[in-house]
C-alpha cells in the first residue's frame, strides 16, 4: 500500500502546477456521449507509463490519444479519492483519510462527496480569479483572508512537506468535478507556468455544480478567455469577470453542435508545456503584462461588480461649482476645432466621481472596467474644470473693478503726511556717527533738506545758507525699518538709518549645503525725531527720491558675473490709510498705495516681464506655463496713477499692460507704485471708542472685536493675524504729568494692569492717579507718540476665540475742571501690519525671464494699515458699564 508520505514526496511539485489545459478531456471530433464509456482503454496506457505509482494511477483515465503527461498521476490520485461508490476503482483507505485530514485544516468536519446531477438545463461557467493559481481552483474564489498574497509567497524557496492551502483548493475543485461527471473521468493537468513566457489561454466552458461548496454558492455563468497570467493582490473581490474572445478553431477541435446534450464540457484545443523544475510554489517569476485584457468589457453576471476604492476621491468636493477662470481656454478651443473636422464615436458611461481622469486604452481607473469615457467628453470636462473662486460675488469682498468706470480712488487727506510737500525737517543726528569705545554717543538737533537732484543737506539749524554736510543718494541706498530707541528721561525717539547695501552670494554648509544671497549693510547716516508725523514725512520723501534716481550705465564688471543660483524676488506692499466712522465703523475715506520692489540675481543681461491682475488684460494673457505664478485671489483690479522706475519701458506697458524691465543687478529697488480701491468692505477688526467728561473726571473706553466680514477672518484655519497692533489715544500736554511716576531710576510711565486692581503708590498733586485696564496686551503713555498706546502683539490672540471682544478702560481724576482743555482730539489712531495679505488684491500672475527658465522666483505680500477712528462723545459711560460703580471700574472682565 502506498503510504501518505510517499505520495506527498512523489507529487510535491505537482500540487502547485498552474494548469493551462481544460478541466476535462476533449472528446474526439464527431463523437457523442456514447464515446465516454468506451474510452476506458486509455487508462491502461496511462497505467503502463507510470509504473512507479501503479496503485494510485490505476483509476485515472485519459481521453486524449496524443497528449500524455506525468500530471495524470496526480489527477488520477484525486479522481480516486473523490469518485462515487459506483466507480470502477476505489481509493485506498489511508489515502482517503489523508485527504480528509487535509480538508479538516479548513473546516472542522471532513468533506462529503456530493454528486451533482449529470444533466443541467443551462451551461454555466466558472468565474476566473486572478488570485487563484490554476484553472482547477477556479470553482471557488477565495475569500479576502484566503487570497492574501502572504499565503502564496510565504516561503517559495524551500519545499514543504505539509500541503498548502492552494492544494486544498485544487483537491476541492477536482473532487466536485469528478462527482458531477463520473468516477472514471480524469483530466490532464500537467501544463504549468514557464519562466519568462506568455501563457495563452483559450476559451473554456464546463458544467458548474449546483450545490454549494464550503458554504459558498455556485457562481453564475461566465466565459473565461485569455485571462491575465499574472497575480494581483486585491481584497474583497467578488468576481473578476473576463470577456469572451473567440479563438481560431483547430482541425481537431470539436464544434458545439457535435456535442450531445449530456456532454458536460466543451473546450477548444490548447497546447501543453513541460513542467517547470521548481519547488512547491514559486510566484516570484511573474509573466508579462497583457494590457489588452484590461480593456475588454466584462460579462454580465448576477454577482455585484467589484469596485475598488479611490483614495484620491473626495466626496465632499462634488458640489463645488466651477469658476469662470480657465487659463487653458485657448488650448481647448483649438482642440475643439480639430475635433469638429473628424467625427469620434464612443460611448461614455456615467462617471461615479467628479474628479476628472482621462481614461486611455491602457490606463487603469478606479471605476468599473465596463464604463469608458470618450476623448471629446474628457476634453469637455477639462474645459469646465475651474478653480473655486475665493472671492465670489455673493460674499463681502468686492467684485472685479469696472475698467470703464470713472470712479477714482480717494485723494489723500490734506492733513496726511503723504500730501504735504516739505522744504525740510527738524531732526536729530546721532553723534558720533560710528561707535567709539572712548566716547559716548548722543543726539544732536539738526535741520535736513532734500534737493530734487537727490542730495541730502544737513544744517546745524534752520535758516543757514551753507550745510555742514552733504551727500548724494544712490541706487544702492536703502531706508531701514523704523524703530524706537531710548532718548531721554521722558521716553524714546523714532530712529532710522540710511544704509549702503551690497548683496553677495555665499555658500553655506550647515546644516546642509545651500547658496544664500546675504546683505551687507554699511551705515551712512542715522537720524531720529520725537515728532511721528515728521518722521513719516521724511521717510516717504526719501523713498520717492530713490525711485526717481536715473539709471546708471551698466557696470561691465558685473555683466559676466555668474551666480550659482539665479533668483528674482518680488515684494508687494500695500499701505492703507483712511478714516472710519464712529459706531458702525464704516470707511469714510481711504487711500491705498501699492509698492512693488525687485531684488534679482541674474547672470549677464536679462530682460524680465511682470504680469499683474490688471483688469485691462483680463482674458488676453499670453505667458509660458513655467512663468505662471500661483495666486490666492481671482479678483481683477484697476490700476491708477502708475509710476515706474527708470528701468521700465513705459511704452510697452501702455500698449500691452505688461511691465517690461531690465532689473538692477544685486540691488533692491522700487519698480513701480500705483493706487487702487480698497478690495474689502470692512477692516480686519472693528474698534468703538467712547469718552465722557464729568467735571474733573475723564473716562475713556474702547471695545475691539474681529470683523466677520473681512475675507481673512471667515475661515479660522486660514486666518491671517494682525501683528504689532497699536491703538493710540492722544493725551493733552496738561495731562502728561498724571501718567508719570517717580522711581529709583527716574520718571517712568504708568502701565495698565491686566485683569487686576491698580495700586500706583501715593496720590499725585492734581488728584488720584489714573486707572488703566486692558484685557489683552499692554497700555501706557509713550512720549514718542504723545499718546496712551495700547499695544497688542497678535490679534486675534492664540488663547482666545476669534470673535472674543477685548477692552481698554482709562479713568482719570483731574485736580479741577480747569485742567480740561477746550478742544480735544476727536480721533483714535490705529496702526498694524498683516503679512501674506493684500489690501488692494494686487497679485503677480506671471514672471518671465528671457532665456532663463530655471530662475527661482519668489513673491511676498504684506499690508500695512494706518487709519483714524472717530471717538463718541458721551455725558456718561454708565449705561455701557451696566450700572457698575465708576470709582471701582471692572468693565474689562476676565477672559
Curated annotation (Swiss-Prot):
Lineage, opening ranks: Eukaryota, Metazoa, Chordata, Craniata, Vertebrata
Name listed for the protein in its UniProt record: Stonin-2
Pfam name, any one: Stonin2_N
The family this protein is said to belong to: Belongs to the Stoned B family.
Task of the protein: Adapter protein involved in endocytic machinery. Involved in the synaptic vesicle recycling. May facilitate clathrin-coated vesicle uncoating.
Source organism of the structure: Rattus norvegicus
Motif NPF 2 in this chain: 326-328
InterPro entries xrefs: Adaptor_comp_med_subunit, AP2_Mu_C_sf, MHD, SHD_dom, STON2_MHD, Stonin, Stonin2_N
Compartments, as annotated in UniProt: Synapse, Synaptosome; Cytoplasm; Membrane
MF terms in GO: clathrin adaptor activity
Gene3D superfamilies named in the record: Mu homology domain, subdomain B
MHD domain location: 565-872
